[in-house]
């Protein structure tokens, strides 16, 4: 009889790995490892009908973290922002449809959690046939090796590489992905915090004036290339102009959540026009997004 496995991975308390943005990078990476392992096992035997991992998103629970009452088991957080644990899922697609290179680590050097970088077992989730890694302008000493022993049943297994860095400067990291001998993807990461900045995105360029339509605005600390930083301090203050109401915390305590956050913008009944959101941070600077509120009228549901 086919056997369906449900609620694999998850998280229990007390537990050394809770998968919060504020937890050590090794804990965040471990979530990706666990999800890769269980899916590899599920595909190792045709008698498994499938596997449902737990969970898609962090969620409120009376059995969650004391004081916060949140279960941090999601591969995405409560704001629906993907964590490193989601990288395994992002990479399970034909590279000719969408090439994927997702580092399951943060490129930081000299911090308490990563004094010499991500270390000897840095994980890369990718569907590319070949990966080339450069620290600064030089090829990394340990080039990626597909871990077919642990993850050989996955169509696109993750890759391990040694990213132990002994130099004292702030080199960039460059990862190139190749398919059929052609470069199809490149990821650049900066270890120099001097170039860090505030970034902000909005999910929808248009919402409608029915008084209930809303869209998410995500802001985060990023490096010079737009990669998320794991740390951030201080508050983000949001300034809204135009016919929309802010749903969420303002100011937002960026450091308490791990360098990122989100709010929602909701339309006002019968009010149309341009909405501008400006986010300000004392050290990361400003970021700005715009969207339009249009008359609802008769909308076609696709």
Predicted regions and their residues:
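Low-complexity, Pro/Ser/Thr- and charge-rich linker/hinge segments at domain boundaries
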Residues: 189-212, 295-302
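Extracellular Ig-like/FN3 beta-sandwich strand-entry sites
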Residues: 168-172, 212-214, 270-274
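Beta-strand-rich structural segments
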Residues: 120-126, 212-230, 275-279
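Extended substrate-binding grooves/exosites of carbohydrate-active enzymes
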Residues: 1-182
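Low-complexity "stalk/linker" and mucin-like segments enriched in Ser/Thr/Pro/Ala/Gly
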Residues: 147-154, 242-258
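Short, solvent-exposed loop/linker segments at the N-terminal edge
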Residues: 109-117, 206-215
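Short, hydrophobic beta-strand segments
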Residues: 156-168, 252, 256-270
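Edge beta-strands of extracellular beta-sandwich domains
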Residues: 181-193, 285-295
């Amino acid at each position: 009889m086919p056997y369906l496995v449900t609620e694999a991975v998850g998280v229990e308390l007390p537990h050394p790995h809770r998968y919060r943005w504020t937890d050590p990078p090794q804990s965040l990476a471990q979530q990706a490892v666990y999800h890769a392992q269980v899916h590899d096992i599920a595909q190792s035997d045709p008698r498994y009908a499938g596997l449902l991992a737990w969970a898609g998103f962090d969620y409120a629970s009376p059995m969650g973290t004391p004081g916060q009452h949140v279960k941090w088991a999601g591969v995405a957080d409560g704001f629906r922002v993907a964590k490193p644990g989601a990288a395994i899922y992002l990479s399970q697609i034909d590279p000719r449809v969408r090439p994927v290179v997702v580092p399951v680590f943060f490129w930081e050097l000299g911090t308490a959690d990563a004094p010499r970088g991500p270390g000897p077992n840095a994980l890369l989730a990718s569907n590319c046939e070949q990966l080339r890694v450069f620290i600064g302008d030089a090829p990394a000493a340990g080039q990626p090796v597909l871990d077919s022993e642990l993850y050989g049943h996955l169509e696109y297994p993750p890759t391990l590489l040694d990213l132990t860095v002994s130099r004292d400067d702030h080199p960039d990291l460059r990862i190139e992905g190749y398919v059929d001998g052609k470069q199809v993807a490149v990821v650049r990461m900066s270890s120099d915090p001097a170039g860090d900045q505030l970034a902000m995105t909005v999910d929808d360029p248009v919402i409608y004036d029915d008084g209930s339509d809303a869209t998410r605005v995500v802001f985060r600390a990023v490096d010079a290339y737009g990669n998320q930083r794991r740390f951030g301090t201080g508050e983000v203050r949001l300034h809204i102009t135009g016919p929309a109401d802010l749903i969420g915390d303002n100011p937002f305590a960026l450091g308490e959540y791990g360098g990122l956050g989100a709010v929602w913008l909701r339309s006002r009944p019968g009010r149309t026009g341009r909405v501008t959101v400006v986010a300000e941070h004392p050290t990361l600077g400003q970021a700005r997004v715009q969207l339009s509120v249009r008359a609802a009228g008769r909308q076609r549901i696709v």
